[in-house]
């Protein structure tokens, strides 16, 4: 039975990370580095820098130090105040700077900017996601 389970996981992962699936293979290293956040902050910041470079530069200028940590705090505050679904759908605003944390599939391909933004989403398939720093327990697969 264990071999069948591993094979199923491998088949799912193989499809997801194929060109047809569109997901990236990843590890839980980013989550382990910031376990107390329950978020891969490095991936989130990389996404924001790639898709919203002007906003990120403005944000960095406003921060005296640790822009990534301050960005996490702004994101966390937005989630606490507005809810995760709202932040995913509409983004959030911090000190006059609007940020998006994902882009939804456009209804048509007529808007090149919308298509480009959608293609820049970072969807990850993570095998053996360790959810606790106190033991070695893990979830077989996580989609992030």
Task: Please give the residue ranges for each predicted region.
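An alpha-helical interface "stripe"
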Residues: 1-144
């Amino acid at each position: 039975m264990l071999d069948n389970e591993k094979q199923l996981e491998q088949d799912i992962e193989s499809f997801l990370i194929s060109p047809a699936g569109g997901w990236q293979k990843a590890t839980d290293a980013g989550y382990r580095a910031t376990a107390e956040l329950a978020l891969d902050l490095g991936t989130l910041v990389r996404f924001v820098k790639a898709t919203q470079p002007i906003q990120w530069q403005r944000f960095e200028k406003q921060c005296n130090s640790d822009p990534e940590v301050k960005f996490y705090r702004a994101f966390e505050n937005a989630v606490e105040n507005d809810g995760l679904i709202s932040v995913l759908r509409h983004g959030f605003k911090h000190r006059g700077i609007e940020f998006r944390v994902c882009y939804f599939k456009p209804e048509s391909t007529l808007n090149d900017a919308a298509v480009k933004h959608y293609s820049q989403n970072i969807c990850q398939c993570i095998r053996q996601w360790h959810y606790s720093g106190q033991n070695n327990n893990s979830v077989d697969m996580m989609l992030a």
